Amino acid sequence: MNQSKKILRTVYLSLFLIGLFMLINDIFSSIMLSFKSSDKEVQFDLNKSFDDNEIFLSKSNGFDLINKSQNIVVETEIYFATFSTFRGNLVSLKLKNHLNLEKDPTDLINVDYKNETFFDVSLDYLVEDLFLYKKIDNLNHEFKAYFKNHGKIYEYVKKYTFSEKNEYLMKFTVIVNSLNDYDLFDIDSYKIVFSSEIERLSDKAKLQYNNYLSQIIYYDNKLKYGKDGLSINNPRWIGSSTKYFEVLISRENMEVEFKKERGVLKSFIVNNVGNKKNISDEFFIYAGPKDNRYLDIFDKSGDNTFGLSDIAFGMSVEKSLWYLIQVPMQMVMQVFYDVIPNWGLSIIFLTIVVRILIFPLTFKGFRATAELSKLQPKMKELQVKFKHDPKKLNEEMGRLYKEEGVNPLGGCFPVILQLPIFFALYSLVNNLFLLRGASFIPGWIDDLSIGDSVYNFGYRLYFVSWTDIRILPFIMMFTQLGSTIVSSNLDLKNLGAQQKFLYFGMPIMFFFILYNMPSGLLIYWITTNIFTILQQYYIKMHLS
């Protein structure tokens, strides 16, 4: 077996592992978003479901009486929250500090509230009516309605409490009181329907962001994925997660059921009632970045407004197999960013540091390849001499390697040992929340979490799924070709078709594979290629 075939197999193995890694990363990290809205009109009638208007008015002190559906907009330090007096639900929740591609606050709620809502309480029947509204203060808001069930009158309150600090958390309280000291209506439990569609995206953003949705649940100290028909008792929390944002819900002693309706997977939170005269249940909702800086503060009671502890929201951020390698890498990136506040430069500097640290492996692999190159004349003689006797050829090749003190796989192991570092860097740059919206070169690379763009088509090209003309993929391809040529000592005249494909076809294939990848990842790749070219020149000079 000659040297070129060994190199070919090594490269194929590396590419296979890289492709497998990227495939597994896509499959297990996400489920593609799918949602259909409706324009169905909803008619409102203040007296529709309540017969005794005198009781209705006497109980409304401090609440606003509104005879038509109205949106209530609340602004906090971190949210623009919009509530509807129809059913008293939250219909929009925008993050003030995290903008979308249109430079508007990102809206985490993606539902058509005329027909279904983000977080809907389902009692014996759904109270489809207008609610009274009361603003206690800027952080506390209540919605109240009254309904009859089997001739008995009940007060129904939904209370929303925002955090005093800049925490992406709110408390949602469900209160149902019997006004005539009745036992609660004849049910053992009630449900909260959690619509799993989050992060409302514009058409442009849908074309740009590779945005996926996962239904997640944390149970028995393990992160699991929701699926149709799944039922779990007493999970720590449930939620919906996209690449950069998530909504997580926690409450003690709840049961969760997952059910697919109209193609959308929904979560049903089942809450036991028993023989009580009232309901007063609290739910804590995290709605914000998928970032441990904001998630982990709810593990210690002294670190958050509501005094929560051991919620484990931070476990929603999956740890890759290379997590132990990623942690120091991110720390190094942060150090560079603190000195020069530009995440693009931080990626470049981190890549250079990593390449310097693994230089001994690179040098060892190149030297092993050079030693094999010196044996090429003798290897060709043996191949000609024993071309009809493969067994004898292998024996003589083995004897030659032993006599010359050369390991034929010496150039392969250093390459394979570098793969975990590549995987760790890939995961870090591809998923780091800090890169979302981070500009490298204004006007060209405005967001390191998506591809660069010099021209947007406004639609997706059918065959290649391109939405923009991008420059970085071309730079990546040409630097990859340069790195391949410099590293391989190519004799173009003597290359076979298979080798030509390996050396020239692979960079072109990666051009199409990585075309829509985040620009931060391509900056890492380009920096690696350029550093490799300079590194190989140095090694050749040293060995000569």
From Swiss-Prot:
Q: Which UniProt keywords apply?
A: Cell inner membrane, Cell membrane, Chaperone, Membrane, Protein transport, Transmembrane, Transmembrane helix, Transport
Which Gene Ontology BP terms does the record give? protein insertion into membrane; protein transport
Per the record, membrane topology reads: Multi-pass membrane protein
**Gene Ontology, cellular component aspect:** plasma membrane
The subcellular location is: Cell inner membrane
**GO terms for MF:** membrane insertase activity
Give the residue spans that cross the bilayer: 15-35, 321-341, 343-363, 409-429, 506-526
Which cysteine pairs are joined by S-S bonds? none
Q: Which CDD domains match?
A: 5TM_YidC_Alb3
Pfam families xref list: 60KD_IMP (PF02096)
Q: Which residues form a coiled coil?
A: none
Protein's job: Required for the insertion and/or proper folding and/or complex formation of integral membrane proteins into the membrane. Involved in integration of membrane proteins that insert both dependently and independently of the Sec translocase complex, as well as at least some lipoproteins. Aids folding of multispanning membrane proteins.
UniProt subunit comment: Interacts with the Sec translocase complex via SecD. Specifically interacts with transmembrane segments of nascent integral membrane proteins during membrane integration.
The family annotation for this protein states: Belongs to the OXA1/ALB3/YidC family. Type 1 subfamily.
The protein depicted here goes by the name: Membrane protein insertase YidC
**Organism, per UniProt?**
Borrelia garinii subsp. bavariensis (strain ATCC BAA-2496 / DSM 23469 / PBi)
Organism placement in taxonomy: Bacteria, Pseudomonadati, Spirochaetota, Spirochaetia, Spirochaetales
